[in-house]
Amino acid sequence: MDVLGIDEAGRGSVLGPLVIAGVIVPEKMDIVLERMGVKDSKRLTPNRRTILSRKLKKMFEYDLVVISAQDIDNMRADGINLNEIERIGMEKILSNLNPEKAIVDAVDIKAERFQNKLANDTGVNVVAEHKADDNYIEVSAASIIAKQERDAHIAEINKDYIKMGGIGSGYPSDPITKKFLTNFTYDEMPDFVRKSWATVEKMKNSQ
């Protein structure tokens, strides 16, 4: 049975898009992925991730959903939380690729609830588990593509801000990202900043 793996990158970032990737791995091709060294993207070097992502895109059918910072802010303003934003993105991929079975990294604290919602909305046989990117090689493959795609977006944005010291990884814990944000007032924030994030809201309240 062909299996679709889905994972995301950039969920907690204050800068840049949330990227969701889906990869269909044909039956028995998981052995090939193991030989290629496919594992959770966070355990790979950026260079290795780039190489593997290119190979995976050539070898397998895949799909990407890129949700911009502005779209995230707009949806949150409409009362749609981050888990729902991710679910909507995953459902687009499930609809586009229409697999026999899908395995996804559960974003809801209750994995079974998330699994049932995806399955009911799409009619696809879905398995949703926490840490699926560690436990299922199909999800690891999706993780690699999602992370590489997001890294490419961040690198492109960074080009315009090198003279300011760069934007860092885009995550709130990154000192370079924190420093970058201090260059702007809340109203001056570039459109790739998630203004609805607590990190930025705190800056607004302190100005």
Curated annotation (Swiss-Prot):
Disulphide linkage map: none
SUPFAM superfamilies assigned to the protein according to its UniProt record, in alphabetical order: Ribonuclease H-like
Cofactor(s) this protein cannot do without: Mn(2+); Mg(2+)
Transport found in the keyword field: no
Residue ranges the record marks as coiled coil: none
Entry keyword annotation includes Metal-binding: yes
GO molecular function: manganese ion binding; RNA binding; RNA-DNA hybrid ribonuclease activity
Pfam families: RNase_HII
Catalysis: reaction(s): Endonucleolytic cleavage to 5'-phosphomonoester
Subcellular location: Cytoplasm
Cited PROSITE patterns: RNASE_H_2
Alphabetically ordered keywords of this record: Cytoplasm, Endonuclease, Hydrolase, Manganese, Metal-binding, Nuclease
Domain RNase H type-2: 1-207
Coarse class of the protein's main subcellular location: cytoplasm
EC number: 3.1.26.4
Cofactor binding description: Manganese or magnesium. Binds 1 divalent metal ion per monomer in the absence of substrate. May bind a second metal ion after substrate binding.
Enzyme class per UniProt: hydrolase
Residues at which a divalent metal cation binds: 7-8, 105
BP GO terms, sorted: DNA replication, removal of RNA primer; mismatch repair
GO CC terms, sorted: cytoplasm; ribonuclease H2 complex
Family membership: Belongs to the RNase HII family.
Role description: Endonuclease that specifically degrades the RNA of RNA-DNA hybrids.
Annotated protein name in UniProt: Ribonuclease HII
Species per Swiss-Prot/TrEMBL record: Methanobrevibacter smithii (strain ATCC 35061 / DSM 861 / OCM 144 / PS)
